């Protein structure tokens, strides 16, 4: 059983008894990591050369753990449909068959490093040279990409998570869609 104490993840090997709705034996609790990143990284830069301009923004977070709940759910061998192929890797020492009472959700096997580095935006533009014009001052054509790539060892959809819910820090629930990658082609005209 795993539990959150602030932003720290703890695990218990067994539950001996319940007393006043609290687990009474803390002897088996182990520190497994922190749900909050130790380091946040942000970097943006822009370059200009003649009529070309290039700008980018990168973000990253390092030194934290994520509980991969979608993987735990879809690797649960007690359901007979919609399972991941990786269920055959047997996180419980060769035990392949689970009953519906055996949950894989909150076990340390699904706790992963959440470190990542993302290219959140990159834009390449070209200012089209104009001969003197009364009406148009500038024309710039550009191409832009958002969420171009993410370098991570995390097996889930996206290691970048919201830290707004204190009770869910570091847990990647099954309630989100993958981040959208978008490409934009544009033309700026100044009059």
Question: Model-predicted segments: where are they?
Answer:
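Repeated loop/turn-to-beta-strand initiation elements of outer-membrane beta-barrel proteins
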Residues: 51-54, 131-132
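Surface-exposed, extracytoplasmic segments of Gram-negative outer-membrane nutrient-acquisition systems
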Residues: 7-8, 12-36, 44, 53-115
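Short, well-structured alpha-helical interface segments that form or flank functional binding sites
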Residues: 36-40, 47, 119
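Membrane-interface anchoring segments and C-terminal beta-barrel signals
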Residues: 46, 67-69, 79, 88-191
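Extracellular interaction modules
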Residues: 1-6
């Amino acid at each position: 059983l795993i539990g959150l104490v602030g932003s720290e993840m703890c695990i218990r090997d067994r539950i001996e008894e319940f007393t006043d709705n609290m687990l009474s034996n803390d002897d088996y609790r182990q520190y497994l990591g922190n749900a909050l990143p130790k380091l946040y990284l942000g970097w943006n830069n822009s370059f200009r050369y003649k009529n070309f301009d290039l700008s980018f923004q990168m973000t990253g977070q390092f030194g934290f753990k994520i509980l991969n709940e979608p993987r735990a759910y879809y690797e649960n061998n007690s359901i007979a449909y919609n399972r991941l192929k990786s269920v055959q890797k047997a996180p419980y020492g060769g035990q392949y068959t689970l009953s519906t009472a055996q949950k894989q959700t909150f076990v340390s096997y699904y706790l992963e490093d959440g470190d990542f580095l993302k290219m959140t935006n990159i834009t390449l533009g070209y200012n089209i040279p104009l001969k003197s014009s009364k009406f148009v001052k500038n024309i710039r054509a550009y191409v832009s990409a958002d969420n171009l790539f993410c370098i991570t060892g995390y097996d889930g959809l996206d290691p970048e998570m919201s830290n707004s819910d204190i009770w869910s820090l570091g847990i990647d629930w099954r309630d989100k869609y993958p981040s959208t990658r978008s490409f934009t082609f544009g033309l700026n005209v100044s009059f």
